[in-house]
Amino acid sequence: MVTVDEVRKAQRAEGPATILAIGTATPPNCVDQSTYPDYYFRITKSEHKTELKEKFQRMCDKSMIKKRYMYLTEEILKENPSMCEYMAPSLDARQDMVVVEIPKLGKEAATKAIKEWGQPKSKITHLVFCTTSGVDMPGADYQLTKLLGLRPSVKRLMMYQQGCFAGGTVLRLAKDLAENNKGARVLVVCSEITAVTFRGPSDTHLDSLVGQALFGDGAAAIIVGSDPLPDIERPLFELVSAAQTILPDSDGAIDGHLREVGLTFHLLKDVPGLISKNIEKSLNEAFKPLDITDWNSLFWIAHPGGPAILDQVEAKLGLKPEKLEATRNILSEYGNMSSACVLFILDEVRRKSVANGHKTTGEGLEWGVLFGFGPGLTVETVVLHSVAAST
Protein backbone atom coordinates (compact mmCIF):
# COMPACT_ATOMS: atom_id res chain seq x y z
CA MET A 1 0.00 0.00 0.00
CA VAL A 2 1.41 3.42 -1.02
CA THR A 3 1.36 6.11 1.67
CA VAL A 4 0.24 9.71 1.18
CA ASP A 5 3.79 10.76 2.05
CA GLU A 6 5.19 8.65 -0.77
CA VAL A 7 2.65 10.06 -3.21
CA ARG A 8 3.56 13.63 -2.19
CA LYS A 9 7.29 12.97 -2.62
CA ALA A 10 6.69 11.48 -6.06
CA GLN A 11 4.63 14.54 -7.06
CA ARG A 12 7.36 17.04 -6.21
CA ALA A 13 10.13 18.16 -8.57
CA GLU A 14 13.72 17.94 -7.38
CA GLY A 15 15.23 21.21 -8.62
CA PRO A 16 14.13 24.85 -8.50
CA ALA A 17 11.63 26.34 -10.92
CA THR A 18 13.49 27.59 -13.97
CA ILE A 19 12.58 30.02 -16.74
CA LEU A 20 13.11 28.09 -19.99
CA ALA A 21 11.99 30.62 -22.63
CA ILE A 22 10.74 34.21 -23.00
CA GLY A 23 8.65 35.81 -25.77
CA THR A 24 7.33 39.36 -26.16
CA ALA A 25 4.88 41.16 -28.45
CA THR A 26 3.42 44.63 -29.01
CA PRO A 27 0.62 46.02 -31.19
CA PRO A 28 1.93 47.41 -34.52
CA ASN A 29 0.84 51.01 -33.77
CA CYS A 30 3.88 52.91 -32.39
CA VAL A 31 3.45 56.32 -30.74
CA ASP A 32 6.25 58.88 -30.47
CA GLN A 33 6.31 60.40 -26.98
CA SER A 34 7.60 63.83 -28.08
CA THR A 35 4.56 64.45 -30.31
CA TYR A 36 2.04 62.53 -28.20
CA PRO A 37 0.67 65.61 -26.32
CA ASP A 38 -0.31 67.24 -29.65
CA TYR A 39 -2.02 64.05 -30.80
CA TYR A 40 -3.69 63.37 -27.43
CA PHE A 41 -5.20 66.85 -27.04
CA ARG A 42 -6.30 66.89 -30.69
CA ILE A 43 -7.99 63.46 -30.65
CA THR A 44 -9.77 64.25 -27.35
CA LYS A 45 -10.89 67.67 -28.70
CA SER A 46 -9.15 69.42 -25.79
CA GLU A 47 -6.81 71.77 -27.65
CA HIS A 48 -8.47 74.78 -25.99
CA LYS A 49 -7.04 73.61 -22.63
CA THR A 50 -3.66 75.17 -23.36
CA GLU A 51 -2.32 75.27 -19.79
CA LEU A 52 -3.25 71.64 -19.22
CA LYS A 53 -1.60 70.68 -22.50
CA GLU A 54 1.61 72.40 -21.39
CA LYS A 55 1.51 70.43 -18.12
CA PHE A 56 1.00 67.21 -20.07
CA GLN A 57 3.88 68.09 -22.39
CA ARG A 58 6.13 68.51 -19.34
CA MET A 59 4.94 65.14 -17.96
CA CYS A 60 5.77 63.44 -21.27
CA ASP A 61 9.14 65.20 -21.51
CA LYS A 62 10.10 64.10 -17.97
CA SER A 63 8.79 60.54 -18.44
CA MET A 64 12.08 59.27 -19.94
CA ILE A 65 9.91 57.46 -22.52
CA LYS A 66 10.80 57.74 -26.21
CA LYS A 67 7.98 55.67 -27.64
CA ARG A 68 5.08 53.39 -26.74
CA TYR A 69 2.93 50.87 -28.57
CA MET A 70 -0.84 51.18 -28.47
CA TYR A 71 -3.69 49.11 -29.84
CA LEU A 72 -5.83 52.29 -29.97
CA THR A 73 -5.30 54.08 -33.27
CA GLU A 74 -6.70 57.43 -34.38
CA GLU A 75 -9.28 55.57 -36.51
CA ILE A 76 -10.51 53.47 -33.56
CA LEU A 77 -10.81 56.53 -31.31
CA LYS A 78 -12.71 58.49 -33.97
CA GLU A 79 -15.19 55.59 -34.17
CA ASN A 80 -15.55 55.63 -30.35
CA PRO A 81 -15.76 59.30 -29.29
CA SER A 82 -17.05 58.39 -25.80
CA MET A 83 -13.58 56.99 -25.02
CA CYS A 84 -12.05 60.39 -25.74
CA GLU A 85 -14.11 62.21 -23.11
CA TYR A 86 -12.97 62.29 -19.50
CA MET A 87 -15.92 60.52 -17.89
CA ALA A 88 -18.36 59.29 -20.55
CA PRO A 89 -20.03 55.86 -20.23
CA SER A 90 -17.87 53.73 -22.54
CA LEU A 91 -17.23 50.39 -20.84
CA ASP A 92 -19.11 48.33 -23.45
CA ALA A 93 -16.99 49.69 -26.29
CA ARG A 94 -13.78 49.16 -24.33
CA GLN A 95 -14.73 45.62 -23.28
CA ASP A 96 -15.63 44.64 -26.85
CA MET A 97 -12.07 45.53 -27.86
CA VAL A 98 -10.03 44.06 -25.04
CA VAL A 99 -11.78 40.70 -24.64
CA VAL A 100 -10.65 39.97 -28.20
CA GLU A 101 -7.31 41.79 -28.36
CA ILE A 102 -5.80 40.74 -25.01
CA PRO A 103 -5.78 36.98 -25.79
CA LYS A 104 -4.65 37.78 -29.36
CA LEU A 105 -1.62 39.78 -28.22
CA GLY A 106 -0.94 37.14 -25.57
CA LYS A 107 -0.93 34.47 -28.28
CA GLU A 108 1.75 36.38 -30.20
CA ALA A 109 4.07 36.46 -27.18
CA ALA A 110 3.28 32.86 -26.20
CA THR A 111 3.99 31.56 -29.71
CA LYS A 112 7.48 33.13 -29.57
CA ALA A 113 8.17 31.64 -26.13
CA ILE A 114 7.00 28.17 -27.21
CA LYS A 115 9.18 28.39 -30.35
CA GLU A 116 12.26 29.27 -28.27
CA TRP A 117 11.47 26.50 -25.79
CA GLY A 118 11.46 24.07 -28.71
CA GLN A 119 9.06 21.53 -27.22
CA PRO A 120 5.59 20.53 -28.48
CA LYS A 121 2.84 22.67 -26.94
CA SER A 122 1.13 19.44 -25.84
CA LYS A 123 3.76 19.32 -23.08
CA ILE A 124 2.35 22.50 -21.48
CA THR A 125 0.57 21.35 -18.31
CA HIS A 126 -0.44 24.68 -16.74
CA LEU A 127 -1.42 28.15 -17.98
CA VAL A 128 -1.28 31.31 -15.88
CA PHE A 129 -2.79 34.34 -17.65
CA CYS A 130 -2.60 37.85 -16.21
CA THR A 131 -4.16 41.09 -17.43
CA THR A 132 -5.30 44.32 -15.79
CA SER A 133 -8.32 44.58 -18.08
CA GLY A 134 -10.97 42.74 -20.03
CA VAL A 135 -12.76 40.73 -17.33
CA ASP A 136 -14.89 38.11 -19.09
CA MET A 137 -16.24 34.56 -18.69
CA PRO A 138 -14.86 32.24 -19.86
CA GLY A 139 -11.71 34.31 -19.48
CA ALA A 140 -8.65 35.23 -21.52
CA ASP A 141 -7.02 32.01 -20.26
CA TYR A 142 -9.74 29.97 -21.99
CA GLN A 143 -9.52 32.08 -25.16
CA LEU A 144 -5.74 31.65 -25.29
CA THR A 145 -6.05 27.89 -24.76
CA LYS A 146 -8.29 27.80 -27.85
CA LEU A 147 -6.12 30.20 -29.90
CA LEU A 148 -2.93 28.22 -29.22
CA GLY A 149 -4.57 24.81 -29.51
CA LEU A 150 -3.46 23.71 -26.03
CA ARG A 151 -4.82 20.48 -24.56
CA PRO A 152 -8.32 20.90 -23.04
CA SER A 153 -6.93 19.38 -19.82
CA VAL A 154 -4.36 22.17 -19.34
CA LYS A 155 -4.73 23.53 -15.78
CA ARG A 156 -5.61 27.21 -16.05
CA LEU A 157 -5.39 30.14 -13.65
CA MET A 158 -6.78 33.56 -14.62
CA MET A 159 -5.63 36.73 -12.84
CA TYR A 160 -7.57 39.91 -13.57
CA GLN A 161 -6.95 43.48 -12.36
CA GLN A 162 -3.90 42.97 -10.20
CA GLY A 163 -2.00 45.89 -11.71
CA CYS A 164 1.69 46.65 -12.05
CA PHE A 165 3.04 44.28 -9.38
CA ALA A 166 1.59 41.19 -11.07
CA GLY A 167 4.66 40.41 -13.19
CA GLY A 168 6.17 39.28 -9.88
CA THR A 169 2.98 37.49 -8.81
CA VAL A 170 2.90 35.25 -11.88
CA LEU A 171 6.50 34.18 -11.25
CA ARG A 172 5.64 33.36 -7.62
CA LEU A 173 2.69 31.23 -8.75
CA ALA A 174 4.62 29.56 -11.58
CA LYS A 175 7.40 28.68 -9.13
CA ASP A 176 4.97 26.91 -6.78
CA LEU A 177 3.24 25.09 -9.65
CA ALA A 178 6.49 23.90 -11.25
CA GLU A 179 8.15 22.77 -8.00
CA ASN A 180 5.10 20.94 -6.64
CA ASN A 181 4.13 19.12 -9.83
CA LYS A 182 6.91 16.91 -11.20
CA GLY A 183 7.31 17.39 -14.95
CA ALA A 184 5.02 20.44 -15.04
CA ARG A 185 5.64 23.02 -17.75
CA VAL A 186 3.86 26.28 -16.98
CA LEU A 187 3.05 28.81 -19.69
CA VAL A 188 2.81 32.27 -18.11
CA VAL A 189 1.31 35.14 -20.13
CA CYS A 190 0.93 38.82 -19.18
CA SER A 191 -1.03 40.79 -21.78
CA GLU A 192 -1.83 44.47 -21.27
CA ILE A 193 -3.83 46.85 -23.46
CA THR A 194 -4.61 50.41 -22.32
CA ALA A 195 -7.96 50.66 -24.15
CA VAL A 196 -9.71 50.42 -20.77
CA THR A 197 -7.81 53.34 -19.23
CA PHE A 198 -7.54 55.81 -22.15
CA ARG A 199 -9.62 58.93 -21.59
CA GLY A 200 -9.56 62.67 -22.21
CA PRO A 201 -7.83 65.16 -19.86
CA SER A 202 -9.31 66.77 -16.75
CA ASP A 203 -8.07 69.94 -15.00
CA THR A 204 -9.02 68.50 -11.62
CA HIS A 205 -7.56 64.99 -12.00
CA LEU A 206 -3.89 65.29 -12.89
CA ASP A 207 -3.23 61.74 -11.62
CA SER A 208 -5.23 60.47 -14.59
CA LEU A 209 -2.96 62.47 -16.89
CA VAL A 210 0.10 60.81 -15.33
CA GLY A 211 -1.30 57.46 -16.48
CA GLN A 212 -1.93 58.81 -19.98
CA ALA A 213 1.73 59.88 -20.14
CA LEU A 214 3.19 56.56 -18.93
CA PHE A 215 1.17 53.51 -19.96
CA GLY A 216 1.73 51.44 -23.09
CA ASP A 217 0.58 48.11 -24.50
CA GLY A 218 2.53 44.86 -24.60
CA ALA A 219 2.44 41.15 -23.86
CA ALA A 220 5.13 38.83 -22.54
CA ALA A 221 5.19 35.06 -22.08
CA ILE A 222 7.54 32.65 -20.34
CA ILE A 223 7.79 28.89 -19.93
CA VAL A 224 8.63 27.74 -16.39
CA GLY A 225 9.56 24.22 -15.28
CA SER A 226 11.80 22.39 -12.81
CA ASP A 227 14.50 19.85 -13.69
CA PRO A 228 15.17 21.02 -17.28
CA LEU A 229 15.80 18.22 -19.76
CA PRO A 230 19.57 18.14 -20.49
CA ASP A 231 20.52 19.08 -24.08
CA ILE A 232 16.84 19.71 -24.90
CA GLU A 233 15.69 22.62 -22.70
CA ARG A 234 17.87 25.71 -22.19
CA PRO A 235 17.57 27.27 -18.71
CA LEU A 236 17.67 31.09 -18.47
CA PHE A 237 17.04 31.93 -14.79
CA GLU A 238 16.21 29.94 -11.66
CA LEU A 239 13.45 31.22 -9.35
CA VAL A 240 14.93 30.82 -5.86
CA SER A 241 12.38 32.56 -3.62
CA ALA A 242 9.34 34.80 -3.93
CA ALA A 243 7.60 37.09 -1.44
CA GLN A 244 4.74 39.59 -1.39
CA THR A 245 4.05 42.39 1.07
CA ILE A 246 1.78 45.40 1.56
CA LEU A 247 3.77 48.53 2.42
CA PRO A 248 2.89 50.29 5.69
CA ASP A 249 0.91 53.55 5.54
CA SER A 250 0.24 53.11 1.82
CA ASP A 251 -3.56 52.70 1.70
CA GLY A 252 -4.93 54.40 -1.40
CA ALA A 253 -1.48 55.13 -2.85
CA ILE A 254 -2.45 53.56 -6.19
CA ASP A 255 -6.05 52.69 -7.01
CA GLY A 256 -7.88 51.49 -10.11
CA HIS A 257 -11.67 51.25 -10.28
CA LEU A 258 -13.72 49.60 -13.03
CA ARG A 259 -16.74 51.80 -13.75
CA GLU A 260 -19.10 52.64 -16.62
CA VAL A 261 -16.41 55.04 -17.84
CA GLY A 262 -13.77 52.29 -18.03
CA LEU A 263 -10.90 51.66 -15.63
CA THR A 264 -10.09 54.84 -13.70
CA PHE A 265 -6.57 55.33 -12.37
CA HIS A 266 -5.80 57.19 -9.15
CA LEU A 267 -2.39 58.11 -7.79
CA LEU A 268 -2.95 59.54 -4.33
CA LYS A 269 0.31 59.49 -2.38
CA ASP A 270 4.05 59.83 -2.73
CA VAL A 271 4.54 56.46 -4.44
CA PRO A 272 8.29 56.87 -5.19
CA GLY A 273 8.89 57.86 -1.54
CA LEU A 274 6.89 54.93 -0.16
CA ILE A 275 8.73 52.41 -2.34
CA SER A 276 12.24 53.78 -1.77
CA LYS A 277 11.64 54.04 1.99
CA ASN A 278 10.63 50.36 2.26
CA ILE A 279 12.64 48.62 -0.45
CA GLU A 280 15.68 47.81 1.68
CA LYS A 281 13.51 45.87 4.14
CA SER A 282 12.28 43.66 1.28
CA LEU A 283 15.84 43.18 0.04
CA ASN A 284 17.14 42.27 3.50
CA GLU A 285 14.38 39.70 4.02
CA ALA A 286 14.96 38.15 0.58
CA PHE A 287 18.76 37.99 0.67
CA LYS A 288 19.52 37.34 4.34
CA PRO A 289 19.41 33.53 3.75
CA LEU A 290 22.06 34.03 1.04
CA ASP A 291 24.20 36.33 3.20
CA ILE A 292 24.07 39.07 0.55
CA THR A 293 24.03 42.73 1.62
CA ASP A 294 25.74 44.42 -1.34
CA TRP A 295 22.90 45.44 -3.65
CA ASN A 296 25.37 46.32 -6.41
CA SER A 297 26.45 42.66 -6.52
CA LEU A 298 23.00 41.77 -7.92
CA PHE A 299 21.54 42.10 -11.40
CA TRP A 300 18.31 44.13 -11.27
CA ILE A 301 14.88 43.75 -12.85
CA ALA A 302 12.56 46.39 -11.34
CA HIS A 303 9.10 47.30 -12.56
CA PRO A 304 9.60 50.78 -14.09
CA GLY A 305 6.54 52.49 -12.62
CA GLY A 306 8.02 55.81 -13.70
CA PRO A 307 11.38 57.63 -13.65
CA ALA A 308 10.85 59.12 -10.16
CA ILE A 309 10.52 55.64 -8.61
CA LEU A 310 13.72 54.44 -10.30
CA ASP A 311 15.64 57.61 -9.35
CA GLN A 312 14.66 57.38 -5.67
CA VAL A 313 15.33 53.62 -5.41
CA GLU A 314 18.73 54.14 -7.04
CA ALA A 315 19.59 56.98 -4.63
CA LYS A 316 18.30 55.21 -1.51
CA LEU A 317 20.27 52.01 -2.17
CA GLY A 318 23.35 53.67 -3.66
CA LEU A 319 22.99 51.67 -6.87
CA LYS A 320 25.45 52.19 -9.71
CA PRO A 321 23.74 53.69 -12.80
CA GLU A 322 24.19 50.49 -14.83
CA LYS A 323 22.12 48.47 -12.33
CA LEU A 324 18.82 49.89 -13.60
CA GLU A 325 19.98 50.31 -17.20
CA ALA A 326 17.84 47.46 -18.59
CA THR A 327 14.81 48.69 -16.61
CA ARG A 328 15.24 52.26 -17.88
CA ASN A 329 15.76 51.01 -21.42
CA ILE A 330 12.45 49.11 -21.46
CA LEU A 331 10.66 52.16 -19.98
CA SER A 332 12.19 54.30 -22.73
CA GLU A 333 11.31 51.95 -25.59
CA TYR A 334 7.86 50.74 -24.45
CA GLY A 335 6.53 52.85 -21.55
CA ASN A 336 4.92 51.25 -18.50
CA MET A 337 3.23 48.03 -19.71
CA SER A 338 2.00 47.11 -16.23
CA SER A 339 2.50 43.39 -15.41
CA ALA A 340 4.36 42.62 -18.67
CA CYS A 341 7.25 45.03 -17.97
CA VAL A 342 9.44 42.85 -15.74
CA LEU A 343 9.28 39.99 -18.26
CA PHE A 344 10.37 42.37 -21.04
CA ILE A 345 13.28 43.43 -18.79
CA LEU A 346 14.21 39.78 -18.09
CA ASP A 347 14.35 39.25 -21.85
CA GLU A 348 16.52 42.35 -22.29
CA VAL A 349 18.94 41.27 -19.53
CA ARG A 350 19.49 37.76 -20.89
CA ARG A 351 19.92 39.02 -24.49
CA LYS A 352 22.35 41.79 -23.52
CA SER A 353 24.28 39.33 -21.33
CA VAL A 354 24.92 37.10 -24.36
CA ALA A 355 25.58 40.03 -26.72
CA ASN A 356 28.12 41.56 -24.30
CA GLY A 357 29.92 38.25 -23.77
CA HIS A 358 29.00 37.87 -20.09
CA LYS A 359 29.50 34.47 -18.49
CA THR A 360 25.98 34.32 -17.02
CA THR A 361 22.46 35.27 -18.13
CA GLY A 362 22.46 37.88 -15.33
CA GLU A 363 25.01 40.34 -16.70
CA GLY A 364 27.84 38.05 -15.56
CA LEU A 365 26.55 38.00 -11.97
CA GLU A 366 25.21 35.02 -10.05
CA TRP A 367 22.27 36.51 -8.11
CA GLY A 368 19.54 38.94 -9.08
CA VAL A 369 16.33 40.52 -7.83
CA LEU A 370 13.04 41.16 -9.58
CA PHE A 371 10.63 43.70 -8.10
CA GLY A 372 6.97 44.34 -8.90
CA PHE A 373 5.23 47.45 -7.49
CA GLY A 374 1.52 48.20 -7.74
CA PRO A 375 -1.88 48.86 -6.15
CA GLY A 376 -2.01 48.25 -2.42
CA LEU A 377 0.77 49.46 -2.30
CA THR A 378 1.90 45.90 -3.00
CA VAL A 379 5.49 44.79 -3.56
CA GLU A 380 6.55 41.45 -5.05
CA THR A 381 10.18 40.38 -4.52
CA VAL A 382 11.63 37.47 -6.51
CA VAL A 383 15.18 36.18 -6.00
CA LEU A 384 16.75 35.01 -9.26
CA HIS A 385 19.79 32.82 -9.88
CA SER A 386 21.44 33.17 -13.28
CA VAL A 387 22.84 30.30 -15.33
CA ALA A 388 25.80 30.04 -17.71
CA ALA A 389 25.14 32.15 -20.80
CA SER A 390 25.03 30.24 -24.07
CA THR A 391 25.24 31.86 -27.48
Curated annotation (Swiss-Prot):
Q: What is this enzyme's catalytic activity, as reactions?
A: (E)-4-coumaroyl-CoA + 3 malonyl-CoA + 3 H(+) = 2',4,4',6'-tetrahydroxychalcone + 3 CO2 + 4 CoA
Q: Which InterPro entries match?
A: Chalcone/stilbene_synt_C, Chalcone/stilbene_synt_N, Chalcone/stilbene_synthase_AS, Polyketide_synthase_type-III, Thiolase-like
Q: Which domain of life is it from?
A: Eukaryota
In the UniProt entry, which residues are flagged as the active site?
Answer: C164
State the Gene3D superfamilies in the record.
3.40.47.10
Please describe the organ and tissue distribution of this protein's expression. Expressed in fruits.
Q: In which pathway does it act?
A: Secondary metabolite biosynthesis; flavonoid biosynthesis
UniProtKB keywords: Acyltransferase, Transferase
> EC annotation?
2.3.1.74
Does Transferase show up as a keyword for this record? yes
**What's one Pfam family here?**
Chal_sti_synt_C
* GO MF annotations, alphabetized: naringenin-chalcone synthase activity; protein homodimerization activity
The answer to whether the entry has keyword Isomerase is no
Look up the record and give one Gene Ontology term from the biological process aspect.
polyketide biosynthetic process
**Effect seen on changing F344L:** Loss of activity
Can you tell me which family this protein belongs to?
Belongs to the thiolase-like superfamily. Chalcone/stilbene synthases family.
Task: Share what the entry says about its subunit structure, partners included.
Answer: Homodimer.
Question: What's the stated role of this polypeptide?
Answer: Polyketide synthase producing naringenin chalcone and slightly p-coumaryltriacetic acid lactone (CTAL). Can use p-coumaryl-CoA as substrate.
**What protein name does the entry list?**
Polyketide synthase 1
Q: Which organism is it from?
A: Rubus idaeus
Q: Which gene encodes it?
A: PKS1
